[in-house]
Design a protein with these regions (language model features):
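Proline-aspartate-enriched helix->loop->beta-strand connector
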Residues: 164-178
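Short, solvent-exposed turn/loop segments enriched in Gly/Ser/Thr/Pro and often Arg
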Residues: 97-101, 111-112, 175-182, 618-619
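Aromatic- and acidic-residue-enriched carbohydrate-binding clefts of CAZyme catalytic domains
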Residues: 124-143
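Short, conserved secondary-structure transition motifs
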Residues: 94-108, 649, 659
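Acidic active-site catalytic centers that drive phospho-/nucleotidyl reactions
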Residues: 144, 174, 252
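Intrinsic-disorder/low-complexity accessory segments
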Residues: 1-83, 87-93, 147, 153-155, ...
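Aromatic- and acidic-residue-enriched segments that line the glycan-binding/catalytic groove
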Residues: 106-123
Length: 765
C-alpha cells in the first residue's frame, strides 16, 4: 500500500459487509500518526494539552445508501490528494470513510444495475429512476443512520463512534445528495445554531463556504448556503461532531436515488453521475485546503472548546435499571458520571418545571458539565433547547431524563460525589419456594419474559397489587409458578436468563397473599405465547413507512428477541389472518387497506380474538369507520388570509410540529401501562390528533395543562392537542385494538416508550 495511506477496518454491518476508513497524510506525518492522534485528544485531559500544528479533517460519505455519487467522490478525493494536491498533506491528516452504509448502498446499486438501460435513460419516468420500496437510503433495519450519531442504536453507528472518539477531528464534513432540482448546498448552515456552538465554529463555517464558493464560481456551478440545514438536533453527522469541538458540516449535491447515471431535471439539464462526483470532489478538496491553511488556529480553538467555565450538575433519580442503562449510554460517549453523597440542595426539577429542594441519594447519578465533553452533556441533558429560529429541520426536544423515564434535576450547587458503582444483582432460587417473581418496569424485564416464553417456561402476571410475605408486586409483575412448569431443567433456564438480563427475582413460599389476590386468583393470569405479524411493503395504493416498519423489526429481532412474521401488503387479500393472534400495522399511507372489504376482514379477525396494533397514521385506516370508536380530532384554527407571500412559511409553522415532548397522563391500572408511573413524557412528531375514545380506554391522554409541552409547537395547533388521545384500547368482540398515536419507537432511542409495545403484545387479553 502507498506509504501515505493506512486502511483501518473497524467492523461489519448487520449484513456482514466491512466498514473501514483510510488515513491519508504525508510520509512524515504517517510515521508519527499515533503521536498526532494522542496529542490531539490530550485536549480532553485537564491541564494537559500537547497541541499539534497538524489539522485533522474527517470526511464521511454515503451514510444514505442511495446517494451514490458520494462514495465515488471519496475515491477520487483520495486520488487527487495523493497526486496533484499532495501539498495539503504536509500539515493535514485526512480521514476518509468512503461508505458509512454499505448495506444500503449495495441494495441501491444492485437494483440499479439490474434495472438500468444501455445507454442510460434520462427521462425521470423511466423505471431506472423509480426505486422500489424500501429504497437504499437506510441500513439493513431501515434506519436512517444520519439520525443515529448520538443515539447509536445501530451497529454501524456503534462501531464508528468508537473510532471517531479515538480521533476527534477538527473538521468533519458529511456528504449527501438531495433532490435533482437543487444544485449544491454547503456551509454556512442555516439558523438555528445551538447556543453551545462557539464564535470560531460559526466563523470557520463562513470561511469554508467562501473557499467552496471560489471553486464553484470558477467552474460555473450553482450552489446555496444558509438555508434548510441547521445545527440543532444532536444526532446528525454535522451536529454531533460540532458538539465535540469540530467544524461540522453537511454537503448536499443534487441527485439521490432517482438520479442514476443521468437524469433531466426540471430545467432540462442533464444531471450526470460524473458531474455529481466532480462537485463532491471539489468541495472535499476545498475543505481540506482551507483546513490546511488554518491548521494552527484549528488546533488552538479545538483545545479552547473543551475548557468549560460553567458549573452545572445534572442529577438523575429513578429506577436503578434505567439509571444503569443511561450510564452505559454515557460510557459509550466517554462522558463522566458519578454517584452523589447524600446532601440537600436547591435544584431545578424537570418534571415540575421549577426550582425545588432536593435531597440526593446514593442511587442517583450525577453528570457534571465541568468536564471535557461538558458541551455535549449540556446539549443532551438540557430540558429546554433555545431556538434562534423556530423553523428547524428536525425535532426540538430530546432531554435524556425524559428519554429514559427518569427524574431530572439541574443545579449550580456543588455536589459531593464518589465513583459510580453499578448495583450487582445476585439471585438465590430457593427450592422450597413455590414461585419466583419480579417487578415489571424495564426492557430487561421484557427480554427476560421473551426468553422465558421462547424456552417454554410458563409465566403469570397480576392485574392487582400483591403483597406476599416480604415480596411486593405492583401490577404487571411476572410470577413463575413451579406448578405450571412441564420441563425438567426450568430452574437452570430461569437463573441463566435472569443473570443475562440483570433480573432480580424474589422467592415466594405460599400462594396466599396478605394483600391482594392469591396466586390462584383469576386476576393472576397466564401470559400467552403470541403469534405476531407485521404489515410491510407497498402496492399500488398503500405504502408502509419503512422507518416505522424497520424500527419495529429491529425491536423484535435485536431487543425483544421474539419471533415476528413479515407480511407483504400486496398479498393482503390472500393472507389468512387467523394464523396470527397479533397484527401490527406500522405508520404509513394507506388506501385500499382501509376499503370496505379489507376492513370487514380485519374486523372479523379481531372479533374472533385478534389483537390489532396501529401506529400513528395507520390509525386513520379505522378513524371514523363503523365498528371502531377512534375519531380524528379536527383543528378548527383558520389560516390568516391576510398574510404576505414572503411571510407564508412563518404562517405555516404556527400549524407545525417537528418534534416536541408532551406530558401524557397515564392510567397505569390498565395492562397497556403496566410498569409506568401516572405521568409519561412522550415525543410527538406529528400534528395529527385523535379524540378521546368514547367506547374504550384512554390509557394515555393529553389533558388541559399549560405546562405540558417541551420544545417547539406551533401556536395554532397547540390548543388542538389538549384533551386528545395518545394511547388507546378498545374491545371488539373477543379481540382488541391498540392505538399508538405517538411513535413509541421513534428512531428506537426513546427508551421509555418501548414497554408499551411489549404490554400490548403480552398483557392485553
Amino acid at each position: 500500500m502507498n506509504k501515505n495511506v493506512s486502511l483501518v477496518n473497524y467492523g461489519k454491518t448487520y449484513e456482514r459487509r466491512p466498514l473501514f476508513y483510510a488515513i491519508i497524510s504525508s510520509e512524515k506525518n504517517m510515521s508519527k500518526i499515533e503521536n498526532i492522534r494522542l496529542n490531539n485528544i490530550s485536549a480532553l485531559e485537564k491541564n494537559i494539552s500537547k497541541s499539534n500544528d497538524v489539522a485533522i479533517v474527517w470526511l464521511s460519505y454515503n451514510v444514505h445508501g442511495n446517494e451514490s455519487s458520494t462514495t465515488e467522490a471519496s475515491m477520487q478525493t483520495i486520488y487527487e490528494l495523493l497526486t496533484e494536491r499532495a501539498d495539503l498533506l504536509e500539515n493535514t491528516v485526512v480521514i476518509i470513510d468512503p461508505c458509512l452504509n454499505p448495506d444500503g448502498r449495495d441494495r441501491y446499486a444492485n437494483w440499479y444495475n439490474q434495472t438500468r438501460t444501455v445507454p442510460y435513460n434520462t427521462n425521470k419516468i423511466s423505471r431506472e429512476h423509480s426505486e422500489p420500496w424500501p429504497g437504499g437510503r437506510a441500513n439493513h433495519y431501515l434506519f436512517d443512520l444520519n439520525r443515529d450519531w448520538a443515539w447509536i442504536t445501530q451497529v454501524e453507528s456503534q462501531q464508528r463512534l468508537k473510532e471517531y472518539h479515538k480521533w476527534l477531528p477538527h473538521v468533519h464534513a458529511d456528504f449527501h445528495e438531495q433532490g435533482i432540482n437543487e444544485p449544491f448546498y454547503f456551509a454556512p448552515a442555516a439558523e438555528p445554531y445551538h447556543e453551545v456552538i462557539t464564535k470560531w465554529q460559526r466563523d470557520f463555517q463562513h470561511m469554508l463556504g467562501k473557499n467552496n464558493a471560489k471553486y464553484f464560481d470558477k467552474n460555473g456551478w450553482l450552489y446555496f448556503t444558509k438555508e434548510f440545514f441547521d445545527l440543532l438536533y444532536p444526532s446528525y453527522g454535522d451536529t454531533y461532531p460540532t458538539y465535540l469541538g469540530a467544524i461540522g458540516m453537511t454537503y448536499e449535491q443534487a441527485g439521490g436515488g432517482i438520479a442514476g447515471l443521468g437524469i433531466l431535471n426540471s430545467e432540462g439539464k442533464n444531471l450526470t453521475l460524473v458531474d455529481r462526483v466532480r462537485h463532491n470532489t471539489v468541495a472535499g478538496i476545498s475543505t481540506i485546503e482551507i483546513s490546511s491553511a488554518n491548521s494552527k488556529k484549528l488546533n488552538e480553538e479545538f483545545n479552547k472548546f473543551f475548557i468549560n467555565n460553567n458549573n452545572v450538575n445534572y442529577i438523575i433519580n429513578g429506577d436503578s435499571d434505567k439509571i444503569n442503562q443511561l450510564s452505559e449510554f454515557l460510557s459509550k460517549h466517554k462522558i463522566d458520571f458519578y454517584s452523589p453523597k447524600v446532601q440537600k440542595l436547591s435544584a431545578f426539577s424537570y418534571n415540575k418545571n421549577k426550582s425545588v429542594s432536593y435531597r440526593t441519594s446514593s442511587g442517583d447519578l450525577v453528570i457534571p458539565n465541568y468536564q471535557a465533553k461538558g458541551k455535549l452533556v449540556d446539549v443532551l441533558f438540557e430540558r429546554n433547547t433555545k431556538l434562534s429560529d423556530s423553523i428547524t429541520y428536525d425535532i426540538t426536544a430530546w432531554s435524556l431524563p425524559f428519554v429514559y423515564g427518569l427524574n431530572g434535576f439541574s443545579t449550580e450547587n456543588k455536589v459531593n460525589v464518589s465513583d459510580y458503582i453499578e448495583n450487582k444483582i445476585e439471585n438465590s432460587l430457593d427450592k422450597n419456594a413455590i414461585a419466583y417473581a419480579g417487578v415489571w418496569n424495564h426492557m430487561n424485564d421484557a427480554r427476560f419474559l421473551s426468553g422465558l416464553i421462547n424456552n417454554k417456561i410458563k409465566v403469570r402476571y397480576n392485574e392487582k397489587v400483591i403483597k406476599n410475605g416480604e415480596v411486593h408486586l405492583p401490577r404487571g409483575s411476572y410470577i413463575i409458578y413451579k406448578g405450571d412448569q412441564i420441563i425438567k431443567n426450568y430452574d437452570e433456564i430461569i437463573l441463566n436468563l435472569a443473570e443475562k438480563n440483570k433480573i432480580k427475582l424474589d422467592n415466594i413460599y405460599t400462594g396466599m397473599s396478605e394483600i391482594g389476590p392469591d396466586l390462584g386468583s383469576e386476576s393472576v393470569k397466564l401470559v400467552r405465547k403470541r403469534k405476531v405479524a407485521i404489515i410491510s411493503g407497498e402496492d399500488s395504493s398503500n405504502m408502509v413507512s419503512s422507518l416505522n416498519y424497520g424500527a419495529i423489526w429491529h425491536f423484535f429481532e435485536q431487543e425483544l428477541k421474539y419471533p415476528l412474521t413479515h407480511l407483504n401488503i400486496e398479498n393482503f387479500d390472500d393472507i389468512e389472518l387467523d394464523e396470527f393472534d397479533t397484527l401490527i400495522i406500522p405508520s404509513g399511507y394507506y388506501g385500499s387497506l382501509g376499503n370496505e372489504t379489507n376492513l370487514e376482514k380485519i374486523k372479523l379477525w379481531i372479533s374472533r380474538g385478534g389483537n390489532l396494533i396501529a401506529f400513528e397514521n395507520a390509525i386513520r385506516i379505522f378513524a371514523n369507520k363503523d365498528g371502531f370508536s377512534v375519531k380524528v380530532k379536527r383543528n378548527e384554527t383558520e389560516r390568516n388570509k391576510d398574510v404576505k407571500f414572503e411571510d407564508l412559511s412563518r404562517e405555516r409553522i404556527q400549524n407545525y410540529l417537528s418534534g416536541a415532548i408532551f406530558k401524557v397522563n397515564i392510567d397505569n391500572t390498565h395492562p397497556l401501562a403496566y410498569g409506568y408511573e401516572n405521568e409519561y413524557y412522550s415525543l410527538k412528531t406529528s400534528s395529527s390528533t385523535y379524540e378521546k375514545l368514547k367506547r374504550g380506554f384512554n390509557v394515555g391522554k393529553i389533558d388541559d395543562d399549560e405546562n405540558s409541552t417541551i420544545g417547539f409547537v406551533g401556536n395554532k395547533i397547540k390548543e388542538n392537542f389538549k384533551n386528545s388521545l395518545v394511547f388507546g384500547h378498545e374491545r371488539i368482540g373477543r379481540g382488541n385494538v391498540i392505538y399508538f398515536a405517538d411513535n413509541i419507537l421513534f428512531r428506537n432511542f426513546w427508551e421509555n416508550g418501548k414497554l408499551f409495545l411489549v404490554n400490548s403484545i403480552f398483557y392485553i387479553n
